[in-house]
């Protein structure tokens, strides 16, 4: 049976939630392998809206096993609130349907406090645009070998020792930022209280995943955010704190890379970004605010963050960036989403290269100062007046919409496997089945 990795191929918000839900119907296991609750997934099923941040998208589908892997950083309090919310919507979540890797690092309240304090202290131009939810500091503690992990909740003595080690590092940091010391006893009490709620879901996920693989079960690996936010291959330092590309799927759950059969990249038919950082095709007017086309994309596409509510920056499709992502993630095919948002544009533009200091480039350079100076080189295409919303076959698409899709394929050097024409899961055109053996 084929195992599929789903990754965002831009800066996140590409519509992964819908595609994962669409694919999860035929998967047996759905696993989150990186990120935290800073990335939101919006699912629309039978007109009911589910907004998930920590939970895998597969939880809304009965009879599936959802997994939170060790590559994730997990806020246990947020997770339990999210479980309560989803249960209130009629979704059953039990230790039989949700497993959390025992070696998953936990996000502590002091991680979010540190995140926000640093962002507030940062001077203009150096802010990252973090969600302030503690993701970065939690990953820092993981790499610094002072993280508190799910398994630590099972033993009081171990837990208190882990807390003491973390505080030895964090209290001096807080002092330098003018933040009060952490209340050690209160934190320990909070952790002991939440332990009884989290531990029933704890499991040796690496073992379970390998058993499922050997049994021929179909596994769907669900990434958060987008590859252009990858800590190594994104627009550093305006990135997230984990690896987002497909290679992380294996290490993020404890399964071998030879277990991955297909990588599906989720690509929006235009480009958006939340927060700071370079964005060559961003549509801005002379006043630095979105121009008419940028406003139109944002309004039609409902471009507001699931997690923060922040308005997303909008721009034309950037073929160079997506082509890079197809290479770094080994993408076999893409799911092109939100094609319907482009309905009604007389002219569409696609970025086919950059001009940097008089030279033409076909990729975005690594250095941040060069990224900021890159100017897009556009190719124009004729738009279409007809509606593509809700289309479920190529025959329902306008000729110019098909031309646009085909040109995207040519420029990114990767085929379209799925085409999404609305937030509804069934408004999807299947070209290549990622789960096909």
Swiss-Prot record:
Binds 1 Mg(2+) ion per subunit. The gene is purA. Homodimer. This is Adenylosuccinate synthetase. Its cofactor is Mg(2+). Gene3D superfamilies: Adenylosuccinate Synthetase, subunit A, domain 1, Adenylosuccinate Synthetase, subunit A, domain 2, Adenylosuccinate Synthetase, subunit A, domain 3. The keyword Acyltransferase does not apply. It comes from Ruegeria sp. (strain TM1040). Plays an important role in the de novo pathway of purine nucleotide biosynthesis. Catalyzes the first committed step in the biosynthesis of AMP from IMP. Substrate binds at residues 306-312. Keywords: Cytoplasm, GTP-binding, Ligase, Magnesium, Metal-binding, Nucleotide-binding, Purine biosynthesis. One of its GO terms (cellular component) is cytoplasm. Residues 288-303 have a biased composition (Basic and acidic residues). GO terms for molecular function: adenylosuccinate synthase activity; GTP binding; magnesium ion binding. It is found in: Cytoplasm. The active site is at residues 13, 41.
